[in-house]
A protein has these predicted regions:
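Ligand/substrate-recognition segments at binding pockets and active sites
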Residues: 345-411, 481-484
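Alpha-helical secondary-structure segments
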Residues: 116-122, 147-151, 193-194, 221-223, ...
């Protein structure tokens, strides 16, 4: 007994020692993760990053962190108009050529100056990536003119090229640092953004530190820590206890509670994203258009919007939302149970069938799936909800392991090319975005025309036609264009919502 007691004491003392001597990633915010002062911002989000390599994944939890580490050639203003970032200016000698003039004196986090060779390396690396190459599809040449000048040529005119170059994944990397890190670059990133990488404790936190030589000036807050806190109730508790300064994407009763608490500030506004129910059209019975149509007529969006989102959003109807240029208000599907049953019978399922829906470990999507489960039961579909960890969810839906799934998509470039091409082009099936594995030659042709048409009105007509076809083909059912929200402690100032839902911390202060 004494030996066991002695062993227990030894274990406890060892654990206390380890906590006291925690690694570098913990020292900046304390071993508990609690905020230690004005020099540190602790942010709670609902999922861990998949990779900090911008060319390795295109997911929101990763983008929230990467937008602090990297800059791009272009940025967008609040109206979605392209603005200079690392490219100071540009000119178009013809419809298929853009010459970019780079800012001088921009430093990477390893101390090297950004040069045209880094831009060429970065764009060519993005073009070679199966995850993000589709964003730059059509570029056929990147040429270094001198240290601060780069020429980009395209096969055909690219109407959205400046918008696409603003995409968070099209970051400019240090060629030297990227090659030195090799396959480990995603865990040891080097960019030229306002914050540099310090550490990543997988599943828990990513720690960043202000970069003193940032070309726009050093960020006001020295340290930023992103905490992976899946349950929004736990994010709320973290804010209430003072362990968190900022929390992202709070829904339900927690949001109302925080809205009414004078200690906090709720910032809510529109975004360029939508939440959708996707169908894997590689698998039966989802390859049958009558089945997809039946499911669409079985759904009533209102209980989802009212109960899960507490009214914070509007019913979806098209593949891009009203905050994206080119949106067309196609007719919504209105719940009609008898029509849905008749369509299922025509498809050969008079008694319905068993089905599975994938959601990631996001409470909002789980709650949405529960309502869908109840609604589809009315037409005989017995729906099983499977919760899949975020990284496994992305990998599995890229392979096509799923049946139905709930996911979101943000048209972060504010241009319909990105809002549509990634989701419905035959060329982007899988990881690039088309997780419904939808293929329609007519749509593919129209998408290519939309990419190259420079006349805005003709372009808008092309995207209107695509939206009408998607409404009929239903590779996905658009559930909601949700509002986004962030809740901060009252002493956090200058936080601005990004319509693309990847919030830049540069400029935020803590009093």
């Amino acid at each position: 007994m004494k030996k066991k007691f002695g062993l227990l004491v030894t274990i406890i003392l060892s654990m206390l020692f380890l906590v006291a001597c925690g690694g570098n990633g913990d020292k900046k915010e304390g071993a508990s993760g609690a905020n230690t002062g004005k020099d540190t911002l602790v942010i709670g989000q609902g999922a861990d990053a998949k990779s900090l390599d911008p060319h390795a994944s295109n997911d929101n939890p990763s983008s929230n962190i990467r937008v602090q580490i990297y800059d791009r050639l272009m940025d967008l203003d609040e109206n979605g108009v392209p603005q200079p970032m690392l490219a100071e200016s540009w000119e178009r000698p013809d419809d298929k050529t853009i010459i970019f003039h780079l800012r001088k004196g921009v430093k990477f986090h390893n101390g090297d100056e950004m040069k045209a060779s880094d831009v060429k390396f970065s764009l060519e690396r993005a073009l070679a990536s199966p995850e993000v190459s589709h964003i730059l599809a059509g570029i056929n040449g990147v040429e270094v003119i001198d240290d601060y000048t780069v020429k980009v040529t395209t096969e055909k005119p690219m109407a959205a090229i400046l918008n696409n170059l603003s995409h968070i994944t099209i970051a400019i990397l240090s060629e030297k640092a990227t090659k030195e890190a090799g396959d480990k670059f995603g865990q040891n990133p080097v960019g030229s953004g306002p914050y540099k990488f310090v550490s990543w404790q997988s599943g828990d936190r990513v720690t960043l530190e202000a970069f003193p030589e940032y070309w726009q000036g050093e960020a006001p807050v020295k340290n930023v820590v992103y905490r992976n806190i899946v349950e929004e109730t736990n994010r709320t508790i973290g804010l209430e206890t003072g362990e968190l300064d900022i929390i992202y994407d709070i829904q339900g009763l927690d949001k109302n509670k925080l809205r009414d608490d004078e200690r906090f500030v709720l910032i809510e506004g529109p975004q360029v994203s939508m939440t959708y129910l996707g169908f894997n059209m590689k698998k039966a019975p989802y390859d049958n258009p009558k089945v997809r149509e039946a499911i669409s007529y079985a759904i009533d969006q209102k209980p989802i919007i009212d109960t899960v989102f507490l009214g914070a959003g509007e019913a979806g109807n098209s593949i891009i939302g009203p905050n994206v240029w080119g949106y067309y208000d196609v007719e919504k599907y209105t719940q009609d149970i008898e029509k849905a049953k008749a369509l299922l019978a025509e498809a050969g399922f008079p008694n319905g069938f068993k089905a599975k829906i994938w959601v990631n470990d996001n409470p909002v999507r789980r709650d949405t799936a529960v309502i869908l489960q109840d609604q589809l039961k009315q037409i005989g579909i017995d729906l099983t909800i499977e919760t899949v960890e975020w990284g496994a969810f992305l990998d599995g839906t890229a392979r096509g392991d799923h049946e139905m799934f709930l996911l979101g998509w943000g048209t972060v470039t504010r241009d319909p090319d990105y809002g549509m091409y990634e989701l419905i082009s035959t060329s982007t099936m899988g990881a690039a975005g088309n997780r419904s594995f939808y293929s329609n030659p007519t749509v593919d042709k129209l998408l290519e025309e939309g990419k190259t048409e420079l006349d805005p009105e003709k372009r808008k007509a092309i995207y209107k036609e695509i939206q009408e076809i998607i409404r009929k083909d239903i590779p996905m059912y658009m559930i909601i264009y949700p509002l986004q929200n962030v809740v901060t402690q009252k002493n956090i100032k200058n936080f601005k919502l990004d319509p693309a839902n990847a919030h830049r911390i540069y400029g935020v202060t803590k009093e």
